[in-house]
Amino acid sequence: APQPYAFGL
């Protein structure tokens, strides 16, 4: 499943 938010954005 994809991450709800990206830390390394």
Curated annotation (Swiss-Prot):
Q: List UniProt keywords, sorted A-Z.
A: Amidation, Neuropeptide, Secreted
Protein family membership: Belongs to the allatostatin family.
Where in the cell is the protein located?
Answer: Secreted
What's this protein's name? Carcinustatin-10
* Protein role: May act as a neurotransmitter or neuromodulator.
One Gene Ontology CC term in the entry: extracellular region
Origin superkingdom: Eukaryota
Which Gene Ontology BP annotations are present? neuropeptide signaling pathway
| PTM-bearing positions, type Leucine amide | 9
